[in-house]
Swiss-Prot record:
Similarity field: Belongs to the protein kinase superfamily. Tyr protein kinase family. SRC subfamily.
Region feature (Disordered): 1-53
Chain ranges of the SH3 domain: 54-116
Annotated keywords: ATP-binding, Cytoplasm, Kinase, Nucleotide-binding, Phosphoprotein, SH2 domain, SH3 domain, Transferase, Tyrosine-protein kinase
Positions with biased composition (Polar residues): 1-10, 18-31
Record's protein name: Tyrosine-protein kinase isoform SRK1
Domain of life: Eukaryota
Domain Protein kinase: 240-493
Record-annotated SH2 domain positions: 122-214
SUPFAM superfamilies per UniProt: Protein kinase-like (PK-like), SH2 domain, SH3-domain
The EC number(s) this enzyme carries: 2.7.10.2
Coarse class of the protein's main subcellular location: cytoplasm
Organism: Spongilla lacustris (Freshwater sponge)
């Protein structure tokens, strides 16, 4: 991945600023002509003379973006662009303000309106306190790093989070009746930029000066590999170059690949006969619409000939199971709980979308840079040919991860996913140990029906084991929701709440 970098934050005088990341790794564009390009779509919006650009809103780049096709527009963080058209939804047609009027499509979530609050690299908007703490506690953020976010409890107010020597401190940014903002009543400001500028110069009751906008661990996902992907995501295998085999399983292999000579991807190749192409495409069309920071994004498929290719985003460290068992996975309890919270976050989104994973396990969770974890392979278990599954595994389901009502009666629900999540918690806290050690699949089913549950592993906090037991309740309706599980894990270590300077000074 790219090296850690920093930039000056907004100073309220109209200078363009934008969000920073330390994950700037994207392979540079290369020999596009040697690789078959996507089928051309209708021409971009009509050319507009630069003299008329004054009609169009100006946006600023929040992250670097390297073009993936000839239709794209490359830009750097801080570059200014005219937005000519937003008709394509997640991909906007833009003209560069600074590079001889070059035009092309850009991902809309990589830019923000010039001089707006969203364009400030220290403004993160709607994120939780626990997310702010995790971001600021990353090793590349120094003491004095800060961010401002929307208040979780009071609409219209904000929260200021600052990295101190020993912890992250949180301050309420409140409003007076006249609309002015304050942290302490002795210092009031008309806009957030003024507040930030003031606390850059002096602490005035804060734990330290505001020195560095918070760096982010990764760029946001784009909506697919390219703008046409929303409608046309069946791609030719000639566009994919398989570089390195990452692993193999009972249904195929996983490769690191390069799409279109520009973009790193993961490619799952499925053994012939693993599933019906028609059923897979039907399920994949749903999977592709599921987008969340803690879900692996499905980019494209190749189904015209076997083996089927499933093209997704690439995660550096592979499966959580192998990560936990390897040298890189020697994690502290705080990190293990954070991994569990991330998985619960992705599953909470699937829960909201009324979507069932069916095969939740550490082997189907992937790990990237800076401890980022994402749920993978959601929905694939539904379209795997059951006879092939049974021939390879000796059972229709991975019994030790499967809820009893699903294993015995094929009743898969989000609550059966919750049961599986409890087993994932066991895998996490034991660094990838196989569940129900020493027991066969039939023995596991029999023991579970007799109310047996795995005991608390060594060095596992009782509170963590209690969450497992909640996931393994016999009555599916009595199991917690993933929303509840996410909250429980995010708040597992209750840090100090808001620090109110008015009460201290």
């Amino acid at each position: 991945m790219g090296s850690c970098c920093s930039s000056q934050d907004g100073d309220g005088n109209g200078k363009a600023t934008a969000g920073s990341t330390v994950d700037s790794h994207e392979l540079s564009q290369s020999v596009k002509g040697k690789i078959k390009q996507p089928e051309p779509k209708p021409k971009p919006p009509p050319q507009v003379p630069p003299a008329q650009d004054v009609k169009y809103p100006i946006y600023v780049g929040k992250y670097d973006y390297d073009s993936r096709t000839d239709d794209d527009l490359s830009f750097k963080k801080g570059d200014l662009m005219y937005i000519i058209s937003t008709d394509e939804g997640d991909w906007w047609f833009a003209r560069s303000k600074d590079t001889a009027g070059k035009e092309g499509y850009i991902p809309s979530n990589y830019v923000a309106e010039y001089k707006s609050l969203d364009a400030e690299e220290w403004f993160l908007g709607k994120i939780k306190r626990v997310e702010a703490e995790k971001m600021l506690n990353q090793s590349f953020n120094q003491v004095g790093s800060f961010l401002i976010r929307d208040s979780e409890t009071t609409p219209g107010d904000f929260s200021l989070s600052v990295k101190d020597q020993d912890r992250v401190r949180h301050y309420r940014v409140r409003r007076l009746e006249d609309g002015s903002l304050f942290v302490t009543r002795r210092s009031t400001f008309q806009i957030l930029h003024e507040l930030v500028d003031h606390y850059k110069i002096e602490t005035d009751g804060l734990c330290c000066k505001l020195l560095y906008p918070c760096l982010q661990a990764e760029k946001p996902q784009t909506a697919g590999l390219l703008r046409q992907a929303n409608e046309e995501w069946e791609i030719e295998k000639t566009q994919i170059k398989l570089l390195r085999r990452l692993g193999a399983g009972q249904f195929g292999e996983v490769w690191e690949g390069l799409w279109n000579g520009t973009t790193s991807v993961a490619v799952k190749t499925l053994k012939p006969g693993t599933m019906s192409v028609e059923e897979f495409l039907q399920e994949a069309s749903i999977m592709k619409r599921l987008r969340h920071p803690k879900l692996i994004q499905l980019y494209a498929v190749c189904t015209k000939e076997e083996p089927i290719y499933i093209v997704t985003e690439l995660m550096k460290y592979g499966s959580l199971l192998e990560y936990l068992r390897g040298e890189d996975g020697v994690l502290k309890i705080e990190q293990l709980v954070d991994v569990a919270a991330q998985v619960a976050s992705g599953m909470s989104y699937l829960e909201q979308q009324n979507y069932i994973h069916r095969d939740l396990a550490a082997r189907n969770i992937l790990v990237g840079e800076h401890g980022i974890c994402k749920v993978a392979d959601f929905g694939l278990a539904r379209v795997i040919d059951e006879e092939i599954y049974e021939a390879h595994t000796g059972a229709k389901f991975p019994i030790k991860w499967t809820a009893p009502e699903a294993a015995m009666y094929n009743r898969f629900t989000i609550k059966s996913d919750v049961w599986s999540f409890g087993v994932v918690l066991y895998e996490i806290i034991t660094y990838g140990r196989f569940p129900y050690p020493g027991m066969t699949n039939p023995e596991v089913l029999e023991k579970i029906q007799q109310n047996y549950r795995m005991p608390c592993p060594a060095n596992c906090p009782k509170q963590f084991h209690d969450i497992m037991l909640d996931c393994w309740r016999e009555d599916p309706a009595s199991r917690p929701t993933f929303e509840t599980l996410q909250w429980q894990l995010e708040e597992f270590f209750n840090s100090e709440g808001y620090r109110d300077p008015d009460a201290i000074h």
